[in-house]
Amino acid sequence: MTQERKFVTVNPLFARPGENTVAAKYELSDEQMLPETAYQIVHDETMLDGNARLNLATFVGTWMDDHANRLYAESYDKNMIDKDEYPQTAAIEENCWRILAKLWHAPDPASTIGTSTIGSSEACMLGGLALKRRWQQARRAAGKSTDRPNMVMSSAVQVCWEKFCNYWDIEARYVPITEEHKTFDGHDLDSYVDENTIGVVAIMGVTYTGMYEPVKQIADALDAIQAKTGLDIAIHIDAASGGMIAPFLQPDLVWDFQLERVHSISTSGHKYGLVYPGLGWVIWRSADLLPEELIFKVSYLGGEMPTFALNFSRPAAQVLLQYYLFLRLGRDGYTQVQQAAQDVAKYLSAGIAKLGPFELWNDGSDIPVFAWKLKDSASKNWTLYHLSDRLRTEGWLVPAYPMPADLPDITVQRIVVRNGFSMDLADKFLTDLAKQTTYLDQLDSPMPIEGQPAFHH
């Protein structure tokens, strides 16, 4: 008589016969696995990741409320590209970009055009493509060559602009960032632009430091260039972070469609738009600034759908989350949330400035992001890379990195304060920072410089 062996549910799950093995990583296993075990393997491996709430390196949102999480769970299976299949979701997408058009002072929000994207990098590339195509149209109409287009931008641009210029054969002309000119401010701009310039990029919230580039000052410089040379050069605003900060914390700042030279603005819904990744937005001042030839009308699932995107299928849930927040927070709520983040940023920067070896690069007065460097008088036994490494032992992820190419000898650390980072956590961070700084200052000899930690964004 065969004795049937019975198994009980045990914890850990891997005590069951056949499961006390190393999971296949680079190929499909021949056999199935119980869902509980597969879940536990993935769950356990991701415990080795950093804590998202203590990640002060990322701009990406890491917290939403329970209602948003419920809405997310209800809509994760919707594809944003299926506008014929999900018409109300498509209508909500349009509601969102029209809200942004009005927020950014489009002269006539009813006649503008925009779209959601997978993130602000795609949004930037779409804005850049429109600039290139309009430049090509104007050159051809004038009987001129369309060879050798260029784009002018700060040396501190986010890497998506380097990709854009590389992928679409555009010469990137970088205006240096220096200690005298901490941002691209329009100085010496006439030596960078010419008849082949498709546009100028201005950044509302530089990735390295969080500082705003003075858009009006850049626009004024381009006005002067046009008066002198006749060159009419447009601006794209990369407002990945600042586009959802400036309207609420600096409402009197002139940076958006109030300036005629601004043709398009992009932002990130998953940064200070407060949505989970990935979501971006790009809006044009008026519909005629987006060349019709770039818009595809695709027959898909029984309907004709206009689309302008680099991606095709992408989640619709984040668009619905953005609309939820627009309804939930309104101007007053967004102002409160962003002000709370900036209050924490200024509290942190003030506390760091009081610690002996540090000198602030900026204090978080633009977006809630700031950077600092070591004073010349600081100990030579350690660097900010070592401090970043020490802070990891406390659970904090704080990047250290060199400034752009024109400031190669300056290393900074940067903190991004996001929604959900409380004043209490900030106080705990300052305590840990002081503790690790004291530890490093007490070293009798220099720390090794090989294998310094790095963050890649």
Locate predicted features.
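Conserved PLP-enzyme active-site core in the AAT-like
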Residues: 4, 11, 118-296, 301-303
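A common structural junction motif
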Residues: 391-399, 434-441
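Short amphipathic alpha-helices in soluble, non-transmembrane regions
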Residues: 383-392, 429-434
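N-terminal entrance/gating region of PLP-dependent enzymes' catalytic architecture
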Residues: 1-111, 395-396, 413, 433, ...
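Conserved PLP-binding active-site segment of the aspartate aminotransferase-like
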Residues: 202, 368-381, 395-430
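Active-site C-terminal subdomain of aminotransferase-like
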Residues: 231, 244, 248-251, 255-368, ...
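Short Gly/Ser/Thr- and Asp/Glu-enriched loop/turn motifs at secondary-structure junctions
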Residues: 109-111, 146, 362-369, 408-410
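PLP-dependent enzyme catalytic core of the Aspartate aminotransferase-like
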Residues: 225, 407-457
